[in-house]
């Protein structure tokens, strides 16, 4: 009787110990996962998630309604950018669109075989190709304002080839291929930001505005102020100047100004001039290798990376600010700014739709390709499992015992 009781107690103790071991193991695994789980992937080598699997980018809106029709060729935008060849990225920097931040990303934040050499105290970085001492990037922070301060499309397309030929003589090699890129911004936000910048003393008066081989005359481009700058100007004064280049700046800087007689307003009627500028800006925007939107930083990063097959080291940050840039602006004033920038409003509406459609197209294409890869992997796995196995039994192999009985006996 005592032996039975002793045996019963022993079995109970063994079972209790087993339960404690299992519970302790579960708690340990839970704690381990809490600390290490976010960075672990059971299927990834070394337990780390590959950078490409970290989805930093927003999910496309499935209910997005397209406003304009764009053929697939306008949405694909996948280039074979050859950094070791003769390809050059040209950044058209429009004032107050976030171009300074993006320009720094290009020289400091792109994962490159040979990173740009950016030294403290110097305004420009050296961005050489991996195989020779030639620049692959034409921008403010790499080549400086070589075609003039904030050069526009008309200036850059006529100036960049000559500047690079003087810097890096082409010799007998094939001609360079230029990939133009830019950023756009909501016109009201951009306009208010430019006013605040001018109010603090900015002028951009050293800009050349070169067109058809000459700069505009004072009669073609009168100043909005007298003196060295326009610091302290009110928003009303800023809006009242009919010659203010802030009005429809994005359209003007993206259009081919030669089509409208440059800055000669008497060349063609105003209504026709406006329509030609808008259509030219749209055409040139479509023809660019890439453009981003200030209001969509992560999507801008995504499209740039997929277009040029280049990766940024750190993700872009979205800094949301008010339209008025910290200044109270009533609805009537906003409507007036929209009227002054009617061409920019139309261009931005067009650009935003093209941008969103490109993003959706790229994401859908990637998901489709991922599903195909997963399907191929499953089929390959099944085909391997279906192969006949002819492995002979190992001599002297003992049949596996019941796991629970084995653990209890060990205790």
Curated annotation (Swiss-Prot):
Residues 1-19 are cytoplasmic. Keywords: Coiled coil, Glycoprotein, Membrane, Signal-anchor, Transferase, Transmembrane, Transmembrane helix. Its EC number is 2.8.2.-. The keyword Transmembrane applies. InterPro entries: Heparan_SO4-6-sulfoTrfase, P-loop_NTPase, Sulfotransferase. N-glycosylated. Pfam families: Sulfotransfer_2. SUPFAM superfamilies: P-loop containing nucleoside triphosphate hydrolases. It comes from the Eukaryota. GO terms for cellular component: Golgi apparatus; membrane. Expressed in fetal brain and liver. Residues 38-411 are lumenal. This is Heparan-sulfate 6-O-sulfotransferase 1. It comes from Mus musculus (Mouse). The lineage of its organism: Eukaryota, Metazoa, Chordata, Craniata, Vertebrata.
